[in-house]
């Protein structure tokens, strides 16, 4: 457990991800010398958390591909194009869990990640970062997780060779999840 973590009670129940207090992001190397960070600004998600039988837990996410944002309009447009996500033809990225396990505050979620019609299994370790009741009476739970994937596994193959060697965009991309979920009434 980290020093900032405050697991205050049993978090069993059904939750809806709060997109205004969550971040679904990514980090990739650019020109092999620096990292570019981005995120998806529109997404929905639900979770059923079963603390007694974690294997009965489940998570589903739907991410609007066209909501990708890196802070650079030209790059964002390129990422939305057919070279990468082809957001017009493939408006959603989805994740559906297939297995969940827990060890204290550490959760492992295995699931099917679908991008551009290609589905691959990924295993994402998460840390339960705490629970709280917000000023509006909502019970919230937080999770942070990350996994590194090879974008080519989903058909995201565009690249450009550099004169100095290497390529413009790394094949490996780190997917980052900072999630605040609200317990359903």
Describe every region a protein language model picked out:
Residues 1-185:
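Low-complexity, acidic/polar, glycine-enriched regions of mature
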